[in-house]
Design a protein with these regions (language model features):
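AMP-forming adenylation/ATP pyrophosphatase catalytic core
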Residues: 1-137
Length: 137
């Protein structure tokens, strides 16, 4: 069980998953559709942003779907293996899960015509060298 506060802007290491998360702020980003990256309306996110593992009863509101859904049900619908579910990062603000890492963003956090500041989050695997350095600490 882990919860790590993201450095915004900056790079945050998520050791339990062997990942790093890069957070960048700008007025606009090119709309690059990649599963390891999302663009959010930075002003719609409240409080500290965290990355964490799933917890019993977690819910989120996937974009394009009316209402909310349990994370467990979302994983089942997406046919994500049970063993893999523990390794999927969940990105949250103080109110809700806004991104199921590498899968789906929620409706609320998406940028729109009135967006003034964008936040781009990108997930990368830590290299073996970075993992060795961190194990030595």
């Amino acid at each position: 069980d882990f919860e790590i506060v993201l450095t915004v802007p900056g790079v945050t290491q998520v050791q339990p998953l062997g990942l790093s998360v890069t957070a960048e702020i700008a007025e606009k980003f090119p709309d690059l559709r990649k599963s390891n990256s999302i663009i959010c309306d930075a002003d719609k996110l409240e409080g500290s942003l965290v990355v964490r593992c799933r917890r019993p009863g977690d819910r989120f509101s996937p974009s394009g779907v009316a209402g909310s859904k349990k994370i467990k049900e979302y994983f089942i619908d997406q046919k994500i293996d049970r063993e893999r579910r523990e390794f999927i990062p969940l990105f949250c603000d103080k109110n809700e899960i806004f991104w199921v890492g590498n899968y789906r963003q929620n409706q609320m956090s998406q940028p729109g015509p009135a967006t003034k500041r964008c936040l781009r989050l990108t997930i990368n695997k830590l290299s073996d060298e970075e993992n060795i350095k961190n194990d030595e600490k």
